[in-house]
Amino acid sequence: MIQENKKTIIDTFKTHENDTGSPEVQIALLTERINHLNEHLKSHKKDFHSRRGLLKMVGKRRNLLNYLKDRDIERYREIIAKLGLRK
């Protein structure tokens, strides 16, 4: 992921000025990496090592989404809507 792209994602989803680790930021960064890896796997179908990494990232994102849903349902709904995940 390009550093400038990462910075724009952090700026978009941060909850306060120095925020880099909130669940929203982590979910947004993981979503970007997942989308990038999906494009890679479309052209490299036999790259099973990357596919395993993709599955780990999807699992981590799912855990963060579940955490956010348990803690603050409004923030969960907001991040789902912004990223276009689920429904």
Curated annotation (Swiss-Prot):
Gene Ontology terms: cellular component: cytosolic small ribosomal subunit
Superkingdom of source: Bacteria
Tagged with keyword rRNA-binding: yes
PROSITE patterns named in the record: RIBOSOMAL_S15
The keyword Ribosomal protein is assigned to this record: yes
Pfam families, A to Z: Ribosomal_S15
Gene Ontology MF term list: rRNA binding; structural constituent of ribosome
Keywords on record: Ribonucleoprotein, Ribosomal protein, RNA-binding, rRNA-binding
InterPro entries reported in the protein's UniProt record: Ribosomal_uS15, Ribosomal_uS15_bac-type, uS15_NS1_RNA-bd_sf
An annotated GO BP: translation
Family matches, as SMART domains: Ribosomal_S15
Purpose of the protein: One of the primary rRNA binding proteins, it binds directly to 16S rRNA where it helps nucleate assembly of the platform of the 30S subunit by binding and bridging several RNA helices of the 16S rRNA.
Quaternary structure and interacting proteins, as annotated: Part of the 30S ribosomal subunit. Forms a bridge to the 50S subunit in the 70S ribosome, contacting the 23S rRNA.
UniProt xrefs under HAMAP family: Ribosomal_uS15_B
Family of the protein in this entry: Belongs to the universal ribosomal protein uS15 family.
Protein name: Small ribosomal subunit protein uS15
Encoding gene, per UniProt annotation: rpsO
